């Protein structure tokens, strides 16, 4: 049936309900019980005493008009409701509206700011009662019980005023006390499972009317059935609507508000368990935890600097010190279980600086270049261990003489990770007390393992073990990368005066051996805190993923204790200051370039003016040691031209005089 076949009155009713469909409303019920006072029966229909109140009289006439008009339009049946009951319903309708208006005045609310619906009904057991739905933006759920008490007071006062039974002043006071104490005005509530208290329950205004009130039948026989007498509302949509149109409005509203798809949900036994109320303190702690994890706070000092407000708030609470400690422990546990050390470092990379970042000239790679190593290979191996992809080789060992850069590299990595636990050699009984729930374990200046060798081997291989903590029970250490620096040979284990050679090879199998022997100059400085995040980002950008499968793809095999970090060599060429495009291209794709190297301008001048003593020496062997890396191995680069070949090409194009004059001009 199309929409134009319905009356305008029906469509207006549907639209009005849809407009207020999701408005939350209070649900009140007014009633009037039969009572007996000193032998005098006061029934529900004994409140029709005439009163000189023009406003009340006008409201009664409006209710009478609405009831008479709806009955005239219903031709299928004839109402058998007696006139006394009708008159009483009309009076009650006026009294209820009067109570509502008095509440609005007490709360300084304009009546036109409220939406209400009133329906008088008759029940076989309950008798007469009236449902009232009330919605206003100025009324909050917390005021529901106060509204009920106010309406109950006004309702009892008006009932005493309009009672047609001849009562003494004492009996009138008693009637009012009964009405208030027995709660002749109630509000819809629900009982909480935990607190066992009643709380006001809000209903959806439009849904409640369409699904519940409009589906009820018109009352015909008060003694035989239940139904409604009269409905009125603030929008004047259902005051004069007949019974059939009310059902039509309910049907149309239900069809239009029906969801397009109905999702079937399966409730598990765990979900059906009784819920638990979260206190404000719990909610505050959870919000603080989310902030701490998002900002990677791992120490009380970081918390004081990054989240001072939440730190002070918790510190001021009873038991604040323990609360701070436990909250921080949950934060570090979350980071340790959900992130790897490599991921924490990679998060801190500034992508705006990555474009101009030169890996070869970073301080870390300068240290590796002093040893003639393939610095990309070394950084790639370290990244795999930090990402927990090194397998049993779970420890990066920097060892060698003093002042060779071991500690500054380890310190830079530890600072970039943040969530780091330190081994305490001075605490003989509990050396790993600080190493639980960490993303990296830092062992500075490691010495003889002694009786702790088995515990060291388990941690260095990335096993899950339990350790003892001071003043606490044992605690589990999950697989955690280890970074270690030392000046000694840690593969030699001494227990007392006895050397234990059976531990040498197992220790080597667990270490990524990086031996630094070149002493750094005094002005070398520290590694910048932004360097290692950029190194990790550079590796990812250029295809060096931090997995052992990717490592073996690039370098042929997994690293060993005696790994030759110099192979495969990185071809370094002599790049003139004017060849910036070539330098950028080589740095952006270290494995795909195949360049013929070009000598610097002064070298070309010397080549042009003087004969070469070593005509068969390739250019690559006399390249400047400070040129940028090209990222390719010897086997990937074409054979470099010899000096004699370059001489022949130049002399074929230029004469000696022209070549000398041109290059002299450039140098001047």
Curated annotation (Swiss-Prot):
Amino acids binding a divalent metal cation: 121, 129, 131
Motif (RCR-3): 212-216
Major site of localization recorded for this protein: host cell
UniProt domain PV NS1-Nuc: residue ranges: 21-260
Cellular compartment(s): Host nucleus
Region feature (DNA-binding): 1-277
PROSITE patterns associated with the record: PV_NS1_NUC, SF3_HELICASE_1
Transcription among keywords: yes
Stretches assigned to the SF3 helicase domain: 367-529
GO biological process: DNA replication; symbiont-mediated arrest of host cell cycle during G2/M transition; symbiont-mediated perturbation of host apoptosis; symbiont-mediated perturbation of host cell cycle G1/S transition checkpoint; viral DNA genome replication
GO cellular component entries: host cell nucleus
UniProt region (Ori-binding), positions on chain: 193-197
Single GO MF descriptor: helicase activity
Catalytic activity: ATP + H2O = ADP + phosphate + H(+)
Subunit structure, interactors included: Homooligomer; when bound to DNA.
Domain comment as written in the entry: In the N-terminus, the endonuclease region is involved in binding to the origin of replication. In the middle, there are the ATPase and helicase activities. The C-terminus probably contains a transactivation domain.
Full protein name: Initiator protein NS1
Native source species: Feline panleukopenia virus (strain 193)
């Amino acid at each position: 049936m199309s929409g134009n076949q319905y009356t305008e009155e029906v469509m207006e009713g549907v639209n009005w309900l849809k407009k207020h469909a999701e408005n939350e409303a209070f649900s009140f019920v007014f009633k009037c019980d039969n009572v007996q006072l000193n032998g005098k029966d006061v029934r529900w229909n004994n409140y029709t005493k005439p009163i000189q109140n023009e406003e009340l009289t006008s409201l009664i006439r409006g209710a009478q008009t609405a009831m008479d008009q709806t009955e005239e339009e219903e031709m299928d049946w004839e109402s058998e409701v007696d006139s006394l009951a009708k008159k009483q319903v009309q009076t009650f309708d006026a009294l209820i509206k009067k109570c509502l208006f008095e509440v609005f005045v007490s709360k300084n609310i304009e009546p036109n700011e409220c939406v209400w619906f009133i329906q008088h009904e008759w029940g076989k057991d309950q008798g007469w009662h009236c449902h009232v739905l009330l919605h206003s933006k100025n009324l909050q759920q917390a005021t529901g019980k106060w509204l009920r008490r106010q309406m109950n007071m006004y309702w009892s006062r008006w009932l005493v005023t309009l009672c047609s039974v001849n009562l003494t002043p004492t009996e009138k006071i008693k009637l009012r006390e009964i009405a208030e104490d027995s709660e002749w005005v109630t509000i819809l509530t629900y009982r909480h499972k935990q607190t066992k208290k009643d709380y006001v329950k809000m209903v959806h205004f439009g849904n409640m009317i369409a699904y519940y009130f409009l589906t009820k039948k018109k009352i015909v026989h008060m003694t035989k059935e239940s139904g409604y007498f009269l409905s009125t509302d603030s929008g004047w949509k259902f005051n004069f609507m007949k019974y059939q149109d009310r059902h039509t409005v309910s049907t149309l509203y239900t069809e239009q508000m029906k969801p397009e798809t109905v999702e079937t949900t399966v409730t598990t036994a765990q979900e059906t368990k009784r819920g638990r109320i979260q206190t404000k303190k719990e909610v505050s702690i959870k919000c603080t935890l989310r902030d701490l994890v998002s900002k990677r706070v791992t120490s009380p000092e970081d918390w004081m600097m990054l989240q001072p407000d939440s730190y002070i708030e918790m510190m001021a609470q009873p038991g604040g010190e323990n609360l701070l400690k436990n909250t921080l422990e949950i934060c570090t546990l979350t980071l340790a279980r959900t992130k790897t050390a490599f991921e924490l470092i990679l998060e801190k990379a500034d992508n705006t600086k990555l474009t101009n970042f030169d890996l070869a000239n970073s301080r870390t790679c300068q240290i590796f270049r002093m040893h003639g190593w393939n610095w990309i290979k070394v950084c790639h191996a370290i990244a795999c261990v930090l990402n927990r992809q090194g397998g049993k080789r779970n420890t990066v060992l920097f060892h060698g003489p003093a002042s060779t850069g071991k500690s500054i590299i380890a310190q830079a990595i530890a600072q970039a990770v943040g969530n780091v636990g330190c081994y305490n050699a001075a605490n003989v009984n509990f050396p790993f007390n600080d190493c639980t729930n960490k993303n990296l374990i830092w062992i500075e200046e490691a010495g003889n393992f002694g009786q702790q060798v088995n515990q060291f081997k388990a941690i260095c291989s990335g096993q899950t073990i339990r350790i003892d903590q001071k003043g606490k029970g044992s605690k589990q250490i999950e697989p955690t990368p280890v970074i270690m620096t030392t000046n000694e040979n840690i593969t030699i284990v001494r227990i007392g005066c006895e050397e234990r050679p059976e531990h040498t090879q197992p220790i080597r199998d667990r270490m990524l051996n990086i031996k630094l022997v070149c002493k750094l100059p005094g002005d070398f400085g520290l590694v910048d805190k932004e360097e290692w995040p950029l190194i990790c980002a550079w590796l990812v950008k250029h295809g060096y993923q931090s997995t052992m499968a990717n490592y073996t793809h690039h370098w042929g095999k997994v690293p060993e204790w005696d790994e030759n970090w110099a192979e495969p060599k990185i071809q370094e060429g002599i790049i003139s200051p004017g060849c910036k495009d070539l330098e950028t291209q080589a740095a952006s794709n270290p494995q795909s370039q195949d360049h013929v190297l070009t000598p610097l301008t002064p070298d070309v001048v010397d080549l042009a003016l003087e004969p070469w003593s070593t005509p068969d020496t390739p250019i690559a062997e006399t390249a400047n040691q400070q040129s940028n890396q090209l990222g390719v191995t010897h086997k990937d680069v074409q054979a470099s031209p010899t000096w004699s070949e370059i001489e022949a090409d130049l002399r074929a194009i230029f004469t000696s005089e022209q070549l000398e004059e041109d290059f002299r001009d450039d140098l001047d």
